[in-house]
């Protein structure tokens, strides 16, 4: 438990974005909405969510299909959106002389359009308020969401590397035992796809919050978090049916193909008096990888 006390509490104490509908724009960038059919059945039925991505490098192609806009667009966000997410910096335009060569690896900016089921959003906010009111006065769903995002990146990386010994204090024993059998039998490219780089996580949402008591009177809270992330793992498209594929241009010549995958992690904590305040992962689902 010492390892969990050092790792998970650190993950679950930082700022995040609210799960309301968020629309971000960067200057002179077109917007494209990802069809909901590309999401997994679990996420569509339970959340009614969608995530859309549009590479900044594909701006020229989209400009031919969309009406011309002004040269500068303001950044739009909902009230209270953290500045770290709301202010997507635009890549500065730079001209090169004949003796100067452009960088070959430039970061590609993405536009994320998030849509949250309003009923689910209200329900999770009410339950988050109950946790704050009755269990933990320091609890914040926005801070928890950001911490869960960091925990997801850390745990998924260890999972892809089959470092199960380092997950013993972070993941429930019965869940870890089942994961060992599934992950070890996966091909290497599927294992690589399990790892989510925190910079490639494009959308995070609170799926559900459960508050319950067991027969002994112990108090538990379960929070289901859903993540969408890009991966460069070489996975045949016919293997992951329904997964979205993007071609991201790096620099002027290199083009990298990425796939949009989804995962669901359920975090659990016992709030019984006298019990250590440790969050553990009670369920791990990687759509189309761990089925």
From Swiss-Prot:
Promotes sorting of SMDT1/EMRE in mitochondria by ensuring its maturation. Interacts with the transit peptide region of SMDT1/EMRE precursor protein in the mitochondrial matrix, leading to protect it against protein degradation by YME1L1, thereby ensuring SMDT1/EMRE maturation by the mitochondrial processing peptidase (PMPCA and PMPCB). The gene is MAIP1. This is m-AAA protease-interacting protein 1, mitochondrial. Its main location: mitochondrion. GO terms for biological process: calcium import into the mitochondrion; mitochondrial calcium ion homeostasis; protein insertion into mitochondrial inner membrane from matrix; protein insertion into mitochondrial membrane. It comes from Homo sapiens (Human). Interacts with AFG3L2. Interacts with SPG7. Interacts with SMDT1/EMRE (via the N-terminal transit peptide); interaction is direct and takes place before maturation of SMDT1/EMRE. Keywords: Mitochondrion, Transit peptide. The keyword Oxidoreductase does not apply. It is found in: Mitochondrion matrix. The keyword Chloroplast does not apply. Residues 1-96 form a transit peptide. One of its GO terms (molecular function) is ribosome binding. GO terms for cellular component: mitochondrial inner membrane; mitochondrial matrix; mitochondrion. Coiled coil: none annotated.
């Amino acid at each position: 438990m010492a390892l969990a006390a050092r790792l998970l509490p650190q993950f679950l104490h930082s700022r995040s974005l609210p799960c309301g509908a968020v629309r971000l724009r960067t200057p002179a960038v077109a917007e494209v909405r990802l069809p909901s059919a590309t999401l997994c059945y679990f996420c569509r039925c339970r959340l009614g969510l969608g995530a859309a991505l549009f590479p900044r490098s594909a701006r020229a192609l989209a400009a031919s299909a969309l009406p011309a806009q002004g040269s500068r667009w303001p950044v739009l966000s909902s009230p209270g959106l953290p500045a770290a997410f709301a202010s997507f910096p635009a890549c500065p335009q730079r001209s090169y002389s004949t003796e100067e060569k452009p960088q070959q690896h430039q970061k590609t900016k993405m536009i994320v359009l998030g849509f949250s089921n309003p009923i689910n959003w209200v329900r999770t906010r009410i339950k988050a308020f109950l946790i704050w009111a009755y269990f933990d006065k320091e609890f914040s769903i926005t801070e928890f969401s950001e911490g869960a995002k960091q925990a997801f990146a850390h745990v998924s990386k260890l999972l892809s590397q089959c470092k199960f010994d380092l997950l013993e204090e972070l993941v429930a024993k019965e869940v870890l035992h089942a994961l060992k059998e599934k992950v070890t039998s996966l091909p290497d490219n599927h294992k690589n796809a399990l790892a989510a780089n925190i910079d490639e996580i494009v959308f995070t949402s609170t799926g559900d919050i459960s508050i319950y008591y067991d027969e002994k009177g112990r108090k538990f809270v379960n929070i289901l978090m859903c993540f969408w992330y890009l991966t460069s793992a070489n996975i045949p498209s016919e293997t992951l049916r329904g997964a979205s594929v993007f071609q991201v241009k790096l620099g002027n010549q290199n083009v990298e193909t990425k796939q949009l995958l989804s995962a669901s992690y359920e975090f659990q904590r016992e709030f019984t008096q006298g019990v250590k305040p440790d969050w553990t992962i009670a369920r791990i689902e990687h759509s189309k990888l761990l089925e």
